[in-house]
Curated annotation (Swiss-Prot):
Key word Hydrolase present: no
Family annotation (HAMAP family): HPr_kinase
Signal peptide: none
Source species: Leptospira borgpetersenii serovar Hardjo-bovis (strain L550)
Any one Pfam family match given in the protein's UniProt record, by short name: Hpr_kinase_C
Cofactor(s) in the UniProt record: Mg(2+)
Protein's name in the database: HPr kinase/phosphorylase
EC number from the UniProt entry: 2.7.11.-, 2.7.4.-
Molecular function (Gene Ontology), one example: phosphorelay sensor kinase activity
Family affiliation: Belongs to the HPrK/P family.
Residues noted as binding Mg(2+) in the record, renumbered to the chain: 165, 207
GO annotation terms (biological process): regulation of carbohydrate metabolic process
Function: Catalyzes the ATP- as well as the pyrophosphate-dependent phosphorylation of a specific serine residue in HPr, a phosphocarrier protein of the phosphoenolpyruvate-dependent sugar phosphotransferase system (PTS). HprK/P also catalyzes the pyrophosphate-producing, inorganic phosphate-dependent dephosphorylation (phosphorolysis) of seryl-phosphorylated HPr (P-Ser-HPr).
Database matches in InterPro entries: HPr(Ser)_kin/Pase, Hpr_kin/Pase_C, Hpr_kin/Pase_Hpr_N, P-loop_NTPase, Ser_kin/Pase_Hpr-like_N_sf
Gene: hprK
Length: 318
């Protein structure tokens, strides 16, 4: 698992929706942002720096701007001295408000990027929080195929050559959608949600033994692919051998941990004559039913228990 960070320059140059313009501190554009939380330093500007989150992006909204611009020069000098005594990665003023010159001077001297945006504070925080959540989410790479089947994101896993790509190709021909083949990039966006995607280089491509590299979007159309998908089920394809024990009732609920999230796991034996794509489709529909609270295996088990209990009573009347 990796915990990536991004440079301040990434926010400035690659996210036009933020509307950022650099005023000072160009030498600090390589400063790293390692957390998705932001900080509004309102209380800190009054002199209370206990628990000051200096390692976050500092956002100056209308309130902070109005406060510092209303101070007399001597007070503002003291505010700046205290504020810039901390190591800061960047400072952003919203609503197009221009910071005082003492902020510009300190940011230039200390190589702290100082930027402004015409976007309102509330909208800006919403936008940048989403960007940081996506960019800084814990992530890992997983060998397999990620495909959307009946709206369920399924990660097909298993040893090389077991038939993952061939199974996915048949599912695509049936109208389902490819997300990633071979290497799946997985990000944890919350405590219980994993998003799978593909690298730009491999996106929409598959490798099939005997055919080579295929462009799925060109062959099957734009409706056969998507860029990312929530991972809700893992299906592990395993070569069938007599000594392996596979679940035959559905009462077991095995899971596999990915980035600290438990994902439902189904182990499917692979051998000649088995129609794996239709098994995957059925697993997807069954998973949708389970999400709605309907579990066929448990219902059948309950019926069986009731039947056996009823038979026991009939054989042993009071």
């Amino acid at each position: 698992m990796s915990m990536p960070g991004i440079n301040v320059s990434n926010l400035l140059n690659e996210h036009e929706e933020l509307g950022l313009r650099l005023l000072a501190g160009e030498k600090g554009l390589t400063n790293r942002i390692n957390m998705s939380e932001i900080n509004r330093p309102g209380l800190s500007l009054t002199g209370f720096y206990e628990s000051f989150a200096h390692d976050r992006i500092q956002i100056f909204g209308k309130g902070e701007w109005a406060y510092i611009t209303s101070r007399i020069p001597e007070d503002l000098k003291n505010i700046a001295a205290d504020f810039f005594s901390f190591h800061l990665n960047c400072i952003i003023f919203t609503h197009g408000n221009m910071p005082p010159s003492i902020f510009t001077e300190n940011c230039e001297r200390l190589a702290i990027p100082l930027m402004i945006s015409d976007v309102s504070t509330h909208k800006f925080i919403t936008l940048i929080s989403g960007i940081l959540d996506r960019s800084l989410a814990p992530r890992t790479m997983r060998h397999g195929v990620l495909i959307e089947v009946f709206g369920i994101g399924i990660l097909l896993s298993g040893k090389s050559g077991v038939g993952k790509s061939e199974t996915a190709l048949e599912l695509i021909e049936r109208g389902h959608r490819l997300v990633a083949d071979d290497m799946v990039e997985i990000r944890r966006l919350s405590e219980s949600y994993l998003i799978g995607t593909c690298s730009d280089l491999l996106r929409h491509h598959m490798e099939i033994r005997g055919l080579g590299i295929l462009n799925i979007k060109d062959i099957f159309g734009i409706g056969s692919v998507r860029d990312h998908k929530l991972i809700e089920l893992i299906i592990r394809l395993e070569e069938w051998t007599e000594d392996k024990d596979f679940d035959r009732t559905g009462l077991e609920n095995p899971t596999e941990e990915l980035l600290g999230v438990q994902i439902p796991l189904i182990r499917v034996p692979v051998k000649p004559g088995r129609n794996i794509p239709i098994i995957v489709e059925t697993a997807a529909m069954n998973q949708r039913l389970r999400k709605l609270g309907k579990n066929a295996a448990q219902e059948f088990n309950q019926k069986l228990s009731n039947y056996l209990q009823q038979g026991k009573v009939e054989r042993n009347p009071p």
